[in-house]
């Protein structure tokens, strides 16, 4: 497959992969040692959901698309809170999002201080057993956070756009697969197969870009 075709395929699979026209503010990073921070980083599943399809809530469009590719046609409900093309750095969730978050079995966010208003709303509305998972924060420890011209270190916010990096996007897929498989073990084989195919595409794209 030619590189151009690979890029197109990967774009279809994960949505607007290269959306990065965002600006940053001066908010400081929350402590990763806090109890709430650990919950988001560890992505702990307390038990499987029985008797119904799992309910998944996510934030930015690229992450929502990755999740949709992994769950496939399992029947899992996937709701993305941030409309495609929206500046996720300035997005404020509407009041109606509280009800969506309250019903969620898992909330996937990017993390890395990207969606703080949505994170705050989630923490105020989700149940004790809801899985809270910041994909970026879970795979990239603070000492490896990336700061650059648009995201200076003194601003306190790292560059959160890890999904534009194929190996890191692959790590997102691994975490998503593991979490939804624990929540819905009856569809775990399908989730694994879907993730394997997506990882294959990501790997081919990575090779073509080198």
Placement of each model-derived feature along the sequence:
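Extracytoplasmic metal-acquisition and chelation regions
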Residues: 11, 22-210
């Amino acid at each position: 497959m030619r590189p151009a075709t690979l890029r197109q395929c990967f774009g279809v699979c994960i949505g607007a992969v290269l959306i990065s026209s965002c600006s940053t503010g001066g908010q400081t990073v929350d402590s990763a040692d806090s109890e709430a921070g650990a919950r988001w980083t560890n992505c702990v599943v307390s038990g499987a959901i029985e008797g119904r399809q799992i309910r998944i809530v996510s934030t930015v469009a690229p992450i929502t698309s990755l999740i949709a590719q992994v769950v496939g046609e399992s029947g899992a409900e996937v709701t993305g809170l941030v409309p495609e093309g929206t500046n996720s750095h300035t997005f404020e969730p509407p009041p109606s999002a509280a009800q969506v978050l309250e019903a969620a079995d898992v909330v996937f966010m990017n993390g890395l201080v990207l969606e703080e208003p949505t994170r705050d709303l989630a923490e105020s509305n989700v149940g004790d057993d809801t899985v809270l998972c910041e994909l970026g924060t879970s795979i990239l420890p603070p000492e490896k956070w990336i700061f650059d011209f648009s995201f200076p270190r003194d601003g306190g916010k790292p560059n959160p756009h890890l999904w534009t990096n194929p190996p890191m996007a692959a790590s997102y897929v691994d975490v998503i697969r593991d979490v939804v498989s624990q929540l819905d073990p009856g569809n775990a084989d399908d989730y694994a197969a879907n993730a394997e195919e997506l990882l294959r595409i990501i790997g081919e794209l990575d090779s073509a870009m080198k």
